[in-house]
From Swiss-Prot:
GO cellular component: protein storage vacuole
Organism: Canavalia ensiformis (Jack bean)
Site, as annotated: Cleavage: T562, L563
Name this polypeptide is given: Alpha-mannosidase
Post-translational modification: Produced as a precursor which is then proteolytically cleaved into a 66kD heavy subunit and a 44kD light subunit. Cleavage probably occurs in protein bodies/protein storage vacuoles.
Signal peptide per UniProt: none
Record region (Disordered): 938-957
Matches recorded under Pfam families: Alpha-mann_mid, Glyco_hydro38C2, Glyco_hydro_38C, Glyco_hydro_38N
Reaction catalyzed: Hydrolysis of terminal, non-reducing alpha-D-mannose residues in alpha-D-mannosides
């Protein structure tokens, strides 16, 4: 029988848009490759290769059928395997609109634990692939599964990509119920305070899950009722199934505005045998439309959005974001903000490294670097998936993510070493394909393992340290390397001796090194280095400086003192910022900045929440996704005193504190920095008492913060948070702690009439202000129960060694940064230091005679004009030579309009000075993901409830002339260009 499947929309009828899709996690219960090929099906029956093979065959059987697909990590794998004939068929399906790409990034990224640069990078990777292969531009965001939605997603990874709409399933259960009653599930979302309506997007929150209505899931092995319309067979049920369809459609129609509603026809890894779905949908379309009471059609998110837009309906306005997300009274998805804190650190560190890899590769010239950054791009793209960086995959899958990142990092390291060898060499670029110098780098600095700096030097050679600065402004920072000798001389490239400070290696680091080098390198390391050697490096913007370390003649003296202080108070800090600690307990008592006069009484401690295992009223446990502390008692204080050791020196003062056998920290105050750097070491978290533990650090001040604090959105905008409050609905407070946690990628701050207190983080984590004047960060978690959201494992990370599998819980080491300012005075520190944390200086090492090196190498150089640096309000967030020879450039303004009187203004970047050593021929401005001309981007107009159009006009930079190449950037603006040299 030939079915009529060609219906379009009908103006006067209820239109049910069937959107066939398969939700394909880029790793979760299985690894990305296991999901692709369909191995390990005892874990989960899932094979994405089958989905794509099967869908393509089904689509060609009927030109009216449609299907949407999002994850380019999978599609790219599939595409590389296809014959020319299959590629031609797929290209026809895409051109005809039957196969539509949604999102189009490498994965469906998480929105809580991702950094905006990573979100842009993987989306660009996918979008440029689609443009090259199909000349197609995705129009719809499809974030159906992430656990809450960010403001940056709404405006930056939405409107600025050229998306008309974004579609998702997960919003807070209280929010959803209110919106159902008001028909406000679908909204116009203005995620940016800065850009308002100029960066708005239509946001469609589904009435429930991202699957079809009950009874309409047609996966081949599901127990569904087929539509039976062959009169020669028993049990025909056309009328019954049409009525079922009608009932479900009319029920959903009560929740939406206009006569259009969407059915998401698919679920996790479905369409393994696509014909099972399409046969049933063909029959439904035919018989429902023949019945005539509603109209049903094959559709896609972009067609659905066009229909909504054409209806001339007025829509509710949504601002800010959709965090935190809860799907039940005791089920706040705020644990994953911190889950697998070490994996989140690796992703953050390699994100900054990937940025520097592409910079240095460009400046050295692609031919000279044997460019291999794709493996790291692929691994980082996969790592942004909403079960990867979020820490919610099974352990074996998490191991696979880590392996991919390590392999990608290894390839990128070769690019950086080769680039630096070429850049520092005095050979011409074309001679540099085989650079003479071989550099090595160190990945395990944080546990003091760096073989190049620990090995003894031959008599006539120095340790050559090349320090590369990936930022667009000059930096003066302390370089810290492990050494075995406190009798070293450090010289700069002019031969000047630098001041060196030595700090004795602490036992905590030595023990970590002994265990983790063995675990990571599968071989025992030599005994820990005896000291940290510290000196100040001065490095030009996007340039490098060279330092030479040699052994001094004669006996050396250590110019750092370890003190036991007399009196009640320990005062430390060689610069403007001072901290006072109790001599008796080691507790922090106050922070004081002698330059600004800000004085803040403040305490800091470590505590842990007991993970709930569920109770008689609700069996919900705390786990990888959810944070549910056990009952309402306050968290357990780890210790009210610490074993404290103070080291003072000309460059840095350090306070080493041990709170118990598994928590310690070092507080560092540098002479030239306005902040305290706190390095924490937590683990193994003990569980022999049968209790899961979620460890926080808490800073308690006297500030009157009125329930308010501010957290970043994906490292970009800061959003105001109010404890126990939601903008969009009257909140019933069921979890006073977990329900007030928010995701951090940059940091958070609080303020009152006297001062502003800021905390920055080095990785994605969760943070809160549970009482006025308090700030807490969750730093590490270890739970003993699964939380029932599908992963099927407790969050119990362990490190195992040797054949006997000696295992212990994972130890996490990381940094956070504290600073105090006058009211409204902290933004400059937050923005600048945030960039320095994201893009640390890169160190590369080799051994050579100092004079020989200086005669054959450039020891200090600039990629840009030596008298120029980027404005302090601008970051270079992408500089990459593409395969077609064009160069991708992205510049980001770092400030919101009212953040800083001087820097929150229109600013200019002179590209001729940025690229002083190369001749820039022309540039084209493109969309954020570089897949379309900026001038050709079209925006849908939406009517918004209560919109009086009184919002301030967003400031954006003007056109760039191909004569002077000056780029203007307004506050929070990101501009993307393709350059031709």
């Amino acid at each position: 029988m030939k079915y009529n499947t060609g219906a379009g929309t009908v103006p006067e009828q209820l239109n049910v848009h069937l959107v066939p899709h398969s939700h394909d996690d880029v790793g979760w219960l299985k690894t990305v490759d296991q999901y692709y090929v369909g191995s390990e099906n005892y874990i989960q029956e899932a094979c994405v290769e089958n989905v794509l093979d099967s869908v393509v065959m089904s689509l060609q059987r009927d030109p009216n059928r449609k299907f949407v697909f999002g994850e380019m990590a999978f599609f790219h794998r599939w595409w590389l395997e296809q014959t020319p004939e299959t590629k031609e068929l797929x290209x026809k399906l895409v051109k005809a609109g039957q196969l539509e790409f949604v999102n189009g990034g490498w994965c469906m990224h998480d929105e809580a634990t991702t950094h905006y640069i990573d979100m842009i990078d993987h989306t660009t990777l996918g979008h440029r692939f689609l443009q090259e292969q199909f000349n197609k531009i995705p129009r719809a965001g499809w974030q159906i599964d992430p656990f809450g939605h960010s403001a940056v997603q709404g405006y930056l990874l939405g409107a600025e990509l050229g998306f008309d709409s974004v579609h998702f399933a997960r919003i807070d259960y209280q929010d959803r119920e209110k919106r159902k009653g008001e028909k406000s599930l679908e909204v116009v979302w203005r995620g940016s305070k800065t850009f308002g309506s100029s960066a708005q997007i239509f946001a469609n929150a589904f009435p429930g899950h991202y699957g079809p209505p009950n009874g309409f899931n047609f996966e081949v092995r599901n127990n569904f009722v087929p539509l039976q319309d062959d009169p020669r067979l028993f049990d025909t049920n056309v009328e019954e199934r049409v009525q079922n369809f009608l009932d479900a459609a009319l029920t959903q129609a009560k929740l939406t505005r206009t006569n259009h509603l969407m059915w998401t026809m698919g679920d996790d890894f479905q369409y393994q045998y696509a014909e099972s779905w399409f046969k049933q949908m063909d029959k439904l379309l035919h018989h429902v439309n023949k019945d005539g009471r509603v109209n049903a059609l094959y559709s896609t998110p972009s067609l659905y959005t066009e229909a909504k837009n054409a209806a001339n309906q007025t829509w509710p306005l949504k601002i800010d974001d959709y965090f935190p997300y809860a799907d039940g009274r005791n089920a706040y998805w705020t644990g994953f903000y911190t889950s697998r804190x070490x994996x989140x650190x690796x992703x953050x560190m390699l994100s900054g490294y990937y940025l520097a890899t592409r910079h240095s590769g460009f400046f050295a010239g692609k031919k000279s670097t044997k460019y291999h950054a794709f493996d790291l791009a692929d691994a980082l793209g996969i790592a942004q998936h909403h079960d990867a960086v979020s820490g919610t995959a099974k352990q074996h899958t998490t191991n696979d993510y880590a392996k991919r990142l390590a392999l990608g990092a290894s390839k990128a390291e070769a690019v950086v070493s080769s680039s630096l060898a070429c850049l520092t060499s005095k050979q011409s670029a074309d001679q540099c394909s085989a650079p003479a110098s071989a550099f090595s780098q160190c990945h395990l600095f944080n546990i003091s393992y760096c073989p190049p700096t620990e090995s003894s030097l031959p008599d006539d050679k120095s340790l050559v340290v090349v320090v590369y600065n990936p930022l667009g402004w000059s930096r003066n920072e302390i370089v810290r390397i492990p050494v075995n000798d406190a009798n070293l001389v450090v010289k700069d490239s002019s031969g000047n001796k630098l001041e060196v400070q030595y700090v004795e290696m602490d036992d905590v680091t030595a023990n970590l090194r002994s265990f983790y080098v063995k675990x990571x390198x599968x071989x025992x390391x030599x005994x820990x280095x005896x000291y940290w050697s510290l000196f100040k490096a001065s490095v030009p913007p996007l340039g490098w400086s060279t330092y030479f370390i040699s052994e001094a003649t004669g006996k050396g003296t250590r110019n750092a003192l370890t003190l036991s202080q007399k009196g009640e108070t320990l005062n430390i800090g060689p610069g403007d910022l001072k901290m006072s600690f109790s001599s008796l307990t080691g507790q922090l008592k106050r922070m004081y900045n002698s330059k600004t006069g800000v004085d803040l009484p403040i305490q800091q401690n470590y505590l842990w929440y007991e993970s709930s295992e569920g109770d008689f009223s609700d069996y919900q446990a705390s786990g990888a996704y959810l944070f549910r502390p056990n009952g309402q008692p306050p968290p357990h204080t780890v210790s009210r005193s610490s074993v404290t050791r103070v080291t003072r020196g000309p460059l840095v003062d350090e306070v080493h504190q041990k709170f118990n056998s598994w928590i310690s920290q070092v507080t560092r105050l540098y002479k030239d920095k306005d902040h305290a750097e706190i390095e924490f070491t937590i683990g193994p978290i003990p569980t022999d008492d049968g209790v899961g533990k979620e460890v926080i650090t808490r800073m308690t001040s006297t500030m009157a913060t009125n329930k308010e604090f501010y957290t970043d959105s994906n490292g970009r905008d800061f959003l105001k948070r109010v404890r126990d409050y939601r903008e969009d609905w009257p909140l019933e407070v069921t979890q006073p702690v977990a329900g007030n946690y928010y995701p951090l990628n940059l940091g958070l701050y609080t303020k009152d009439e006297k001062s502003e207190f800021s905390v920055l983080v080095d990785r994605a984590t969760g943070g809160a202000s549970i009482k006025d004047g308090e700030v807490e960060l969750m730093l590490h978690r270890r739970t003993l129960r699964d939380d029932g959201r599908g992963v099927g494992e407790p969050l119990d990370e362990q490190v195992c060694m040797n054949k006997e599998y000696t295992c212990e819980g994972l130890t996490v080491r990381g940094n956070y940064y504290l600073s105090i300012h006058k009211p409204a005075g902290g933004s400059r520190w937050r923005r600048t230091t945030g960039q320095e944390i994201y893009s640390p200086m890169l160190l590369a090492f080799t051994q050579e005679n100092m004079e020989n090196w200086k005669s054959s190498h450039s020891t200090k150089a600039y990629a840009m004009d030596p008298n120029y640096s980027l404005p302090p309000s601008v970051a270079l967030i992408t500089l990459e030579e593409l395969d077609d020879g064009l160069v991708l450039l992205r510049l980001a303004h770092l400030y919101e309009p009212s953040e800083d009187a001087e820097y929150s203004t229109l600013t200019k970047v002179e590209l001729k000075k940025l690229f002083a050593t190369q001749k820039l021929e022309e540039l084209r401005e493109v969309s954020l993901s570089a897949n379309q001309e900026k001038s050709e981007m079209k925006k849908m107009k939406w009517s918004v409830e209560g919109d009086n159009e009184q919002e301030p006009q967003a400031v954006r930079g003007g056109p760039v002339s191909n004569a002077d190449f000056v780029v203007e950037l307004g506050p929070m603006e990101i501009r993307t260009f393709l350059l031709q040299f």
